[in-house]
Amino acid sequence: MRSKGFTLIELMVTLAIVGILAIIAIPSFTEQIAKSRRAEAMRILGDMQLRQERWRSNHTEYGTCDELVAPSTCTAYNATIPHYSISITGITPTGHTLTATRKGAQSDDRCGDFVLTVSNGVASKSTSTGAANCNWP
């Protein structure tokens, strides 16, 4: 009579295969999640840059974060973004700096914070760490 079921060796081989696949897949999956969060930060920076240009077309200088997200506040706006906080500094009639600062689960991301600086109509993009392959389009 033949028993039905798995032997201990078959079960151990299956667990070993699953373990090896997990070791390979989890880092790749984690990096893809980080990439999607970085893309969201860049989308938000692009949106804020469009708001800045819209604001500047009607005023003598670029706007503050609170002015751009009115009637809300910048603090309330940032509360809706789970992985980055947006700030605007260096506001002049000819330029400004937008920064997406990491927070929460993204706080240890290798790419650091994303910075978009506009000066005299020329935009420059950078990261706080200078890391390569950080998805800036």
Residue locations for each model-derived region?
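Alpha-helical interaction segments
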Residues: V18-I20, I44-L45, Q52, T73-A76
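Short, contiguous strand/loop micro-motifs
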Residues: K4, E31-Q32, R38-A39, S126
